[in-house]
A protein has these predicted regions:
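Extended catalytic cores and adjacent scaffolds of nucleotide/polyanion-binding enzymes
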Residues: 1-142
Length: 142
């Protein structure tokens, strides 16, 4: 499954707003599709466990990079949050801005490690090693 989608929307000189918005929608659509595919794989697992997993999108617009996370909210809605935003340094004088970019990557890394733990739990629930409690993922697929 695609856990991270990366999209570069504009060049360094000027922003093309329409293109940036279309890319934002594309990231959301890809993330939702990835999560839907995962619901089919873990349909007998707990919905509460599944709500903890997300798909990530990185969008670069001019000199700004943004990390977003998309998760299931309920049967009919998804939620998307901006997790981190950083400015990309262009000159040596701006070099300290690289710390923001590294924090963004660190945040993504921690999130992906957490996602591996959740995937393990979902697998245990799927094969009934750990009995899921509450509604199952398949309840939102009907």
């Amino acid at each position: 499954m695609e856990m991270v989608v990366v999209e570069s929307s504009s060049g360094m000189v000027e922003e093309h707003t329409t293109h940036s918005l279309e890319d934002s929608v594309k990231i959301l659509e890809c993330n939702v599709a990835a999560l839907r595919e995962k619901t089919c794989h873990y349909e007998n697992a707990s919905l509460e466990t599944f709500k903890k997993i997300g798909a990530y999108g990185i969008q670069i617009i001019k000199m700004q990079v943004t990390l977003g996370k998309t998760m299931i909210h309920d049967k009919h809605r998804w939620k998307s949050i901006e997790m981190w935003s950083a400015q990309i340094p262009r000159t040596w004088d701006d070099r300290l801005l690289i710390l923001e970019c590294l924090e963004l990557l660190g945040t993504l890394y921690i999130e992906l490690l957490h996602a591996q733990e959740i995937e393990s739990k979902l697998l245990e629930e799927r094969v009934n090693v750990d009995r899921p409690s509450g509604p199952l993922i398949r309840s939102i697929m009907e």
